Amino acid sequence: MGLEVQRPLMEAWYMDDSAEDQRMPHHRNPPEYVSLKKLAELGILHWVLDADNYETDPDLKHIRKERGYSYEDFVDVSPEALPNYETKIKNFYEEHIHTDEEIRYCLDGSGYFDVRDPEDRWIRIWVHKGDMIVLPAGCYHRFSLDANNYLKAMRLFVGEPIWTPYNRPQDEHPVRKEYINLFLKPHLDKSDLSLATQNAETV
């Protein structure tokens, strides 16, 4: 009996400042990886599921029931399959927030979700087949395909599907303020406390 090949866990890293092709990885030199724990602290949820059997997968059913994801649809993101591809890809890569969670389950292909950390630096999240990711409401983010130019995803919603992007700046939006208070402010407060402690030690 052969050994089962394990798929890699979802990867994330800090992006460089290069303006080259958005489909490239954009690693810093040297690379700076970000843990799943760090992503969770920013409110980003992740599961690895059985994409080949999504219609009958009990784990997916459990997640949907627990989190109230009652509506689904599907999207193929590729030059061949997506109408108005160039326009939509450009819109996907505009930094924005939503007033609801963004839930995406990658059924095939791969792509990048970029999110901001508490210091406003970009973190690039690389999703593959089987990755299900949830970005919280109010989180600045954007999406890009990678060099494979293909991703098929299930989109999930709580109730009526709403996909209204609010492009940055949206810092006065109530949902953005709530996200800052829940996920960013605790990190910034810790940073301020750490800096104050360091300054006190040098006095």
Swiss-Prot record:
| Keywords noted in UniProt | Amino-acid biosynthesis, Cytoplasm, Dioxygenase, Iron, Metal-binding, Methionine biosynthesis, Nickel, Nucleus, Oxidoreductase
Q: What is its main location?
A: cytoplasm
What InterPro entries would the database entry show? ARD (IPR004313), ARD_euk (IPR027496), RmlC-like_jellyroll (IPR014710), RmlC_Cupin_sf (IPR011051)
A single Pfam family it belongs to is ARD
Where Ni(2+) binds, per the record, is at: H96, H98, E102, H141
Q: What is its EC number?
A: 1.13.11.54, 1.13.11.53
Report the pathway entry. Amino-acid biosynthesis; L-methionine biosynthesis via salvage pathway; L-methionine from S-methyl-5-thio-alpha-D-ribose 1-phosphate: step 5/6
Q: Extract the GO molecular function terms from the UniProt entry.
A: acireductone dioxygenase (Ni2+-requiring) activity; acireductone dioxygenase [iron(II)-requiring] activity; iron ion binding; nickel cation binding
Q: Binding of Fe(2+): at which residues?
A: H96, H98, E102, H141
The Gene Ontology biological process annotation of the record reads:
L-methionine salvage from methylthioadenosine; methionine metabolic process
| Free-text remark on how the cofactor is bound | Binds either 1 Fe or Ni cation per monomer. Iron-binding promotes an acireductone dioxygenase reaction producing 2-keto-4-methylthiobutyrate, while nickel-binding promotes an acireductone dioxygenase reaction producing 3-(methylsulfanyl)propanoate.
The cofactor named in the record is: Fe(2+); Ni(2+)
- Please indicate if the UniProt record lists Amino-acid biosynthesis as a keyword: yes
Covalent S-S links between cysteines: none
What EC class is this? oxidoreductase
GO cellular component annotations, sorted alphabetically? cytoplasm; nucleus
| Record-linked SUPFAM superfamilies | RmlC-like cupins
Question: Gene3D superfamilies, alphabetically?
Answer: Jelly Rolls (2.60.120.10)
The reactions it catalyses are: 1,2-dihydroxy-5-(methylsulfanyl)pent-1-en-3-one + O2 = 4-methylsulfanyl-2-oxobutanoate + formate + 2 H(+); 1,2-dihydroxy-5-(methylsulfanyl)pent-1-en-3-one + O2 = 3-(methylsulfanyl)propanoate + CO + formate + 2 H(+)
Q: Subcellular localization, per the record?
A: Cytoplasm; Nucleus
What PANTHER family does the annotation carry?
ACIREDUCTONE DIOXYGENASE
Q: State what this protein does.
A: Catalyzes 2 different reactions between oxygen and the acireductone 1,2-dihydroxy-3-keto-5-methylthiopentene (DHK-MTPene) depending upon the metal bound in the active site. Fe-containing acireductone dioxygenase (Fe-ARD) produces formate and 2-keto-4-methylthiobutyrate (KMTB), the alpha-ketoacid precursor of methionine in the methionine recycle pathway. Ni-containing acireductone dioxygenase (Ni-ARD) produces methylthiopropionate, carbon monoxide and formate, and does not lie on the methionine recycle pathway.
Q: Which family does it belong to?
A: Belongs to the acireductone dioxygenase (ARD) family.
Annotated protein name in UniProt: Acireductone dioxygenase 3
Species of provenance: Physcomitrium patens
